[in-house]
Amino acid sequence: CIQSPGPVFFRQKRGGKGGAPFTILKFRSMKHRASGVADELQAMRNDDRTYAFGRFIRKFSIDEFPQFINVLLGDMSLVGPRPYMIEHDKLLGKDFRAYRVRQFVKPGVTGPAQCAGLRGEVVSPDLLHARNEMDFHYVGNWSLLLDMEIVLKTAIQVIIPPQSAY
């Protein structure tokens, strides 16, 4: 990257359909750390690991574009619950009885919680619960019309990012 030496792509193991692990791709928006330990920490607002151009591509969701490769590989869908890190899947599966419901479908590049503005760091259990409830509703009420609505709302948020975008 121009402002931060290191690989162009960020790769991380995430939980996919049925909990099967896959490697998610993103444009790297944070400083590269050789240890990889920082990669396991969730990005936060004003994160010192993010460099200037990285903040820009995150705000406008440009860092997510490589996930279309994941869609072509069959690991992800355009719309679905966003995939979490495998470690988070394990913890959430213990805390939320119905958590595995969100893994009945492929994870999405965008999802119901993201187009509702619930993106970014998880700052409270209530926010996490709200995201999961939206994912459960999506899985139980899937339709092509619902996917089209989510894609349209996501497109609007890419053009006019919400306050939660950083």
Q: Over which residues does each language-model region extend?
A:
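C-terminal terminal-structure detector
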Residues: F96-Y166
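A short, structured surface patch at a secondary-structure boundary
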Residues: A43-K106, I150-V158
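A hydrophobic, helix-centered structural microdomain
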Residues: C1-R33, N70, L144-Y166
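Short, glycine-rich, amphipathic interfacial segments at transmembrane boundaries or analogous
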Residues: V8-R49, T110-E133
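Short, hydrophobic secondary-structure boundary micro-motifs
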Residues: F10-R11, V79-P81, I86-E87, S124-L127, ...
